[in-house]
Amino acid sequence: MEVLAMILAGGRGSRLDILSENRVKPSVPFAGKFRIIDFTLSNCSNSGIYDVALLTQYLPFSLNEHIGSGKPWDFDRRDSGIALLQPHEKPDGQVWYTGTADAVKQNIEYIKRKNPEYVIILSGDHIYKMNYNWMLEDHKKNNAELTIAVKTVPWEET
């Protein structure tokens, strides 16, 4: 099963206040050893998804530096790996992403060129552990057009 993971990692993260003043939210340190993005990247690697596109926009420098070649997640492969996709001027003159859906839309040519069987769109600023294969298997079993993974969380914990 050929899967392309598109990780949205370009948001400003204003609710983190000073922590994201000079870096994008997925690049914010976590537990002194990790960055928030590490959770999503580890989930991909642990699920056997090695074709990953990271869509960045706001202050991408520390995130790009942290990701590097993707070696810590085994993304430094010859025929797959990690691609850092920043917004760039298109023939229609559009440059910046205007939101998450627009970030994916502006990279549709990249998706077409990769021609994966499945595309998983993930957030780069969530902290969780998940095996994406379970979701993909359920998606295939139900012959679904779209699958969204959610978890109910009590209001007090949000």
Q: Residue spans of the language-model regions?
A:
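Unchanged
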Residues: 1-158
